[in-house]
Amino acid sequence: MYKFLDQLSPDHVEAIASLVFMEMLEAGYGAVAEFHYLHHDVGGRPYANLAEMSDRIIAAATKAGIGLTLLPVYYQFSGCDLRPLVSGQQRFGNDPERFLRLHADASKSVATGPKDYTIGLAPHSLRAVDTSGL
């Protein structure tokens, strides 16, 4: 999975999500809850717009015309023992402060979308987020 994700640009993510959302509509779904954890560039560096990838998911949902609950995933560690993220996980990782900024920026983007768009929080797991991060 990590090798595939290392190939994806924001344009790729938007194109893939647009296709998936269109196919969901054709299958009868009216909305999607997008468990979204790809936040940073291939090197794990944040984009200038922290919510770049979230904005691409929002754009894809808007193009397709599907309802959206955006669930940015908070991913902090590689294991329960607080191991640092491995190279393939760097695109997911945030510290608490940066994740809150990312979520705030994504919330502003969601607010400009259709009225049925909403945003939540998605801590990845007990392995990837410690109690202080919650």
Where are these regions (language model features)?
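Metal-coordinating catalytic core of metallo-dependent amide/deamination hydrolases
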Residues: 40-134
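Metal-associated gating/positioning segment near the N- to mid-region
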Residues: 1-45, 51-52
